[in-house]
A protein has these predicted regions:
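Extracytosolic ligand-binding ectodomains
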Residues: 2-5, 9, 16-445
Length: 445
């Protein structure tokens, strides 16, 4: 026992306590002493020769060259470079109904933190957790946020929470990464909506659809809503317009849809549409698929989560459905699809994706925090919102070139296919059946 005490004695004698200092790290400022200008070629030459500080002397703001700007964004946090906006306070609050949004309370926080960490600007990011989204809780927390001196809020709320905040009508800037403006009646100039547009994605996908259209959905709100919308939209005769922007794999701009809204055609009700609602516990689709002539050569739409989608794809192959193609919105843009399904099951699949702008520095910084902004659209739209607020507060140019119209972020849409090991751009095949189906409808009329 004495020996043990003697062995522990040095540990007690030389023990130290470690407290994190509240003194901020010193900033690095690079002064450009050269009277000469430096163009893109000149700056690239500095990078190629490892003259990092000479490069940074000319890189005081966002650069036009994407690769050079990426290098600049990498060096700013490494050297803790000082910002010309150092005097401005950068304070952003996170309003988190953690019981409602689950894991996203953490991932939204990480996405916000990852973005601000790359900017080299002093910031205060504070989380305000609430148990419910009722008006009383929201009113109380917004008053507290305002009292604490915050004027910008990231609020990943459900539709109920967004509706209640809209009724409160606070005069404070709020960004909703989970809500699309078409799902809100708010006219507040202080609200910005950041969610992707499932309707626009469905419209683009339906241009690739054939009759009969078979819609598989789960019993969730989004599954039911998408099924109802797609069924309604496919009933319009011009939805299979041959002028689809995906013909050569081009990215579809949301503005083209806005311009076409006023030209919606007369409803065509003769199209054959089948709607199957699959419960969470259902694992066998034999009754839907086996020897079902109604779905031969059909277009299949899957409005189901990734696990359920994998089950549907495998059973489409098992029961020799011989579908023409399989369509899905952002729900199934997930690398898990590539590993959990066979290529033969997914080779005819087309997925709409609105995560079209990528910043490698932010992707890698998020990855260090165990976060994903490359495939998870809520984390991605959160990053877009933080970027927007950062630009408003500091006056810096935005990192992402996402347009805003009527307080809604407008995301371009691309159509992708899950190939053998990655998602690739979709190129529409020859569509002879379009003309055959059109002629058949004209004969029927």
């Amino acid at each position: 026992m004495k020996k043990k005490l003697l062995l522990l004695l040095p540990a007690f004698v030389f023990a130290q306590s470690f407290i994190i200092s509240n003194i901020p790290l010193p900033k690095t400022y690079i002064q450009n002493l050269s009277p000469l200008e430096c163009n893109t070629y000149c700056m690239q030459n500095y990078l190629d020769n490892g003259q990092v500080f000479s490069f940074l002397a000319y890189a005081g703001s966002k650069l036009k060259d994407a690769k050079q700007n990426e290098a600049r964004e990498l060096f700013v946090p490494i050297f803790n470079l000082g910002s010309i906006h150092n005097s401005k306070q950068l304070k952003i609050a996170l309003l988190l109904p953690y019981k409602k949004i689950g894991k996203y309370a953490s991932s939204v926080t990480n996405a916000s933190l990852a973005y601000l960490m790359t900017k080299g600007h002093p910031f205060m990011l504070k989380s305000y957790k609430i148990e419910s989204e009722n008006i009383e809780d929201l009113s109380s927390v917004i008053k507290r946020i305002h009292k604490d001196g915050f004027e910008y809020i990231i609020a990943p709320l459900t539709h109920t929470g967004a509706k209640n905040i809209s009724n409160l009508d606070p005069t404070i800037h709020i960004y909703f990464p989970t809500i699309n403006k078409q799902d809100s009646n708010s006219t507040s100039p202080y609200f910005i909506f950041g969610a992707i547009d499932y309707h626009a994605q469905s419209n683009l996908l339906l241009k690739e659809a054939y009759e009969p259209l078979v819609i598989f959905s789960d019993k969730s709100k989004i599954g039911k809503a998408l099924a109802a919308y797609q069924r309604e939209e496919f009933s319009y005769s011009s939805i299979d317009d041959l002028g689809s922007s995906s013909l050569f794999g081009n990215t579809f701009s949301i503005f083209s849809q806005i311009n076409e809204e006023s030209n919606k055609p007369i409803k065509q009700t003769t199209k054959e549409i089948l709607n199957y609602s699959v419960s969470r516990r259902t694992t066998n689709l034999e009754s839907y698929l086996k020897e079902n002539e109604k779905i031969a050569d059909a277009t299949i739409i899957v409005n189901t989560p990734i696990i359920k989608t994998g089950m549907i794809l495998s059973q489409l192959t098992l029961y020799d459905v011989n579908e023409t193609n399989i369509l899905s919105t952002q729900i199934n843009y997930d690398p898990l699809l590539l590993s959990m399904t066979q290529y033969i099951d997914r080779k005819e699949m087309v997925i709409a994706n609105s995560i079209t702008e990528h910043n490698n520095i932010l992707i890698e910084t998020n990855a260090l925090l165990g976060n994903d902004i490359e495939y998870d659209w809520i984390n991605y739209t959160t990053t877009i919102g933080i970027d927007y607020f950062y630009s408003l507060i500091t006056g810096d140019e935005r990192t992402y070139n996402i347009k805003i119209k009527d307080n809604q972020m407008l995301y371009d849409i691309e159509l992708l296919q899950p190939a053998r090991s990655q998602f690739v751009r979709y190129i529409r095949p020859t569509r002879e059946r379009d003309f055959m189906q059109k002629e058949q409808r004209e004969e029927d009329q």
